[in-house]
């Protein structure tokens, strides 16, 4: 029996997404800005629509919640475009918020992958 083939592009994009979940990275405006496309926008789990600069400002003020993610699935939609979906649980003290998440990553003309769109949907 052979191991399933891995796609290095999909693996790379999943690793970038996981970086964005790291609390140390999330508090580093420059690190997050490097991972987000200038045209980034998000439909947040809370229902808030976030644009690039507003999200960068908000992450600097974020609480000390932990985010655990699993169930990652990545699909190459076109050359230079990847859809990533997964489940997350955000925990702060005794409160857990579950979400279904999707992100669209695009490869820029400089060859770097950046998140263009993200959506968080509340989950049971």
Stretch-by-stretch model annotation:
Residues 2-34, 39-124:
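A beta-strand edge to alpha-helix "cap/lid" segment located at domain peripheries
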């Amino acid at each position: 029996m052979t191991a399933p083939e891995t796609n290095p592009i999909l693996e790379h994009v999943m690793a970038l997404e996981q970086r964005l979940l790291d609390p140390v990275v999330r508090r580093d405006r420059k690190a997050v800005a490097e991972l987000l496309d200038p045209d980034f926008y998000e439909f947040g789990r809370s229902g808030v629509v976030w644009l690039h600069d507003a999200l960068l400002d908000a992450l600097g003020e974020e609480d000390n919640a932990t985010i655990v993610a699993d169930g990652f699935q990545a699909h190459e939609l076109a050359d230079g475009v990847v859809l990533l979906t997964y489940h997350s649980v955000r925990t702060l003290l005794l409160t857990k918020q579950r979400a279904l998440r999707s992100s669209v990553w695009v490869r820029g003309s400089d060859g770097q992958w950046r998140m263009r769109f993200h959506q968080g949907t509340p989950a049971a």
